[in-house]
Every structure is written in structure tokens, then in C-alpha cells.
């Protein structure tokens, strides 16, 4: 059976082309002894296999065989593409691989049915384009194994929302350029959360900018609250 999943602790999680940017960064945090909730990745190759075995890939290729149309037409194509992904059956071996990884995660957590978040983790092949996490709809929350295959397909389908298509079109989008994995990670209730990123400083180097909020970072991602902001030399 093909390997459809990679745990964040496994060496394969170093490969952005397999696990996507977000999962790769989580693996690096683990390597540096930073505490990260347990999880695994449904690999980018799994999406390729799903599209091929379900017939969805041929339907999507037909939809995107011409240049993307104007706004109204784009909305129609987007809806058809999303429906194609969500309406296609996942093969038994792919579903079994994903459920098997979830059950292994449950044993790690000593929990019968761990609550997990299921965002998409994208890499552009072969590193031609920047990565913008906020472009994609994300983070379904699953409470047991029965909804997991649906959540994974929803993550894949987020590649074909109008927002995603506009972004891809703006950077010279091609179907073959996009490789998307799905991160399945134990969902915890944080006391505080946030994001950290680098920004140029006045001397030509980089400082670290940290934006933090109480509770979940979802409020920060959606712009609902004003974060505490710190700049570190």
C-alpha cells in the first residue's frame, strides 16, 4: 500500500514538496524542542492519487483547459470545481491510510477520538511562487474518524475557491504547479496564541514581529481582535 500519510515527527516531514510549508515548519519546531501538538500530514501525492483514481482530475482539467473567465464565470467554474472534489469518492486504500493514521494519533493521545483541526498545507512546485496561507479556506474541526474523509476533501476543495483561483491567476497559475497536503493536528484550547514572522530592519537585516491574542489564533486570522504586537531585534 502506498504511504498516504506522514507524521510530523518523521524525517519525510522535512520535504516541503511532500508535506507543504506549514507542516514542514511544524517539523522544524519539533526538531528544536518546541512543543507542538501531535499530528500527521495527508501528503501532496495523496491528492494526486485521489484526483487520478476518482476521475476528478480529468474533470478539473477540462474545467481549467481555457483561461480563467471574468468574475461571474470564475464563480461558476469555482463552484463546479469544488463540487467535483467534494462529490468524488476517495478510494478505499486512501481512506484506510488516513483513518489508520488518525487511530494511531488517538493511541498517542490515549484518547478514543481526539479532536483535530484539518487545514490545507500548500507548497508550490518547484518553489516558483510565494506561500500565502491566508489565501485558502481552512481549519475544519473534526471530533471523530467518521467525518475525517469529508474534512480532508474540504481542505483539497479550498484550492478551487474564487479567492484561491484569483491568487493562482495573479501569479501565472497552472494546475501542475500546485501541490497541496492536508495537516491533521490535535486541536487544543490555548491560553494564548499568535503568529511570528520576520520584517526588514533599518540596517538591512531582519527583526522578528510577534502578534499575539488570548485564546485561539482564529480571531487573529479573521481580524476580529487587535493583537498585542512585539518587535524583537
Locate each region found by the language model.
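Short beta-strand elements
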Residues: 120-124, 137, 186, 195-216
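Short conserved micro-motifs at the rims of enzyme active sites and ligand-binding pockets
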Residues: 129-130, 195, 219-224
